[in-house]
A protein has these predicted regions:
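A structural detector for beta-sheet-dominated domains
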Residues: 44, 61, 77-79, 110, ...
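A non-catalytic, helix-rich entry segment at domain boundaries
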Residues: 2-94, 98-106, 115
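A sequence/structural signal of beta-propeller blade repeats
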Residues: 84-274
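Sterically constrained small-residue positions within well-ordered secondary structures
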Residues: 51, 149-151, 161, 244, ...
Length: 368
């Protein structure tokens, strides 16, 4: 225990301000509408008494704002997986983190890291034991997606994409929830992430390379594959092409609920350092394509008032005008070693490079 506490005491980073009141979006101040919190992410958890309980007080950062010390206490194992080796935080969606227990192998959805959820009564929703399809695995998870803001909603469907062919769905609010497991045949989806399209009411997966989009309709038990055609691709300089060729490419599919638009983001990242066998990567280039219903992916440097948020959580879009600190026509990206803002019009890059324990951007939460 003393060794764990000693390691934790060295991990807390940065200066912060202390606050018990979180600022609300000016864009939702009307009394006729619910208030909305600004997008944020967890920076760390500050070790607190009683130390033997291994609890920490959350330190968060609202996007483009200072860090804030909260009074909310969380189990440190949610942030420091490598120290405690009890649970693995495998993804997040709508402010809920998904964890996989090393003791019982159960996947749980928890709101502990959501600064706007209950301080005294955190929720932990266990899902049924995972079922592994033949020639598949359920130990390594690509990401988790939810069809609504809470797994307690009656119609909420949770999708878990595993590395490899398996895609699994569950309705946690049912009296006897169970998994619906699908084996994906096309290998271009094996390492891809799943997202939920509110516009279509279906889960979608972007294939590696960004040329195919798979859609799964759970109600009619159907799926379809759409091939994308890239258009309006700009002519790039030789230097830029060489830079892109030296990078790893990450594709993201994200939908704007307010405008109904769907975007494909190609993010080019390069390893800048190897630390204890782990690659620290930096965003070198980024391209945004707007998708239409005909399968066209049109390159654009103008997404208007929108901001695209990318992290290890499910991606989302917001209107910048609803939150004064946001930059319109930009992309925000948070990873384990990088926090970067890219303004698309003039490709202005604002970058922070430091470790992030929980690189899960939390979208705005509705509060009373």
């Amino acid at each position: 225990m003393s060794l764990i506490l000693n390691r934790l005491s060295k991990l807390w980073l940065g200066k912060s301000r202390r606050s018990t009141l979180l600022l609300l979006s000016n864009g939702f101040s009307s009394c006729s509408r619910k208030k909305q919190t600004p997008p944020c992410f967890v920076v760390s958890a500050e070790l607190c008494e009683p130390y033997e309980a291994c609890l920490g007080k959350l330190v968060i950062s609202e996007v483009h704002n200072d860090m804030i010390n909260l009074e909310k206490k969380v189990h440190l194992e949610l942030l420091y997986n490598d120290i405690f080796d009890k649970v693995v935080t495998i993804g997040a969606s709508n402010g809920w983190v998904a964890t996989l227990s090393g003791d019982d192998g159960i996947l749980r959805l928890q709101d502990d890291l959501n600064p706007y959820a209950s301080y005294t009564d955190p929720k932990s929703i266990p899902l049924p034991p995972l079922v592994t399809l033949p020639c598949c695995q359920t130990q390594i998870v690509t990401n988790v997606s939810m069809s609504s803001s809470s797994p307690e909603d009656e119609d909420c469907v949770v999708a878990v994409k595993f590395l490899g062919p398996q895609l699994s769905f569950c309705r946690p609010a049912q009296s006897k929830p169970e998994w619906t497991n699908i084996r994906i045949e096309n290998s271009c989806f094996f390492s891809s992430r799943v997202m939920f399209s509110k516009k279509e009411g279906m889960f979608r997966i972007l294939g590696a390379g960004g040329h195919l989009v798979g859609t799964w309709d759970l109600q009619n038990h159907k799926h379809k594959i759409q091939r994308l055609r890239f258009k309006n691709i700009p002519e790039l300089t030789k230097t830029t092409n060489e830079l892109m060729d030296s990078c790893c490419t990450y594709e993201h599919l994200v939908e704007s609920v307010t405008t109904g638009e769907t975007f494909l983001v190609k993010q080019y990242k390069k390893t800048v350092e190897i630390d204890d066998g782990v690659a620290k990567m930096r965003t070198e280039y980024l391209m945004v394509f707007k998708l239409d219903g005909e399968g066209n992916a049109v390159h654009t440097e103008d997404i208007g008032d929108l901001v695209i948020f990318l992290s290890m959580s499910e991606p989302f879009c917001l209107r910048a005008s609803s939150f004064p600190v946001l930059f319109p026509n930009s992309v925000e990206s948070l990873d384990y070693w990088e926090n970067v803002t890219v303004e698309l019009a003039d490709y202005l890059v604002i970058r922070g490079f430091r470790p992030f324990l929980a690189p899960y951007l939390i979208p705005p939460q509705h509060i009373d």
